[in-house]
Amino acid sequence: SKVDMTARLLKLKRDIDNKMAWPKWSPTERWAAQQALNSALDILDEYHY
C-alpha cells in the first residue's frame, strides 16, 4: 500500500542518515541519496489509486 511504501522509504532515509545503510558512503553520496528519496516520496504523494 501507499502507506507501507512511504514507511519503507522513510526508514531507508533514516538508515542512510544514521549510516546504518551503506556506512562507507561519503556525505555527498548520502546527500544525493536523500534527494533521490525525497523525489520518490514526492511522486508517491502525488499518486492516487
Q: In which residue ranges do the predicted regions lie?
A:
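Short, charge-rich amphipathic interface segments used for partner binding and complex assembly
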Residues: 7-49
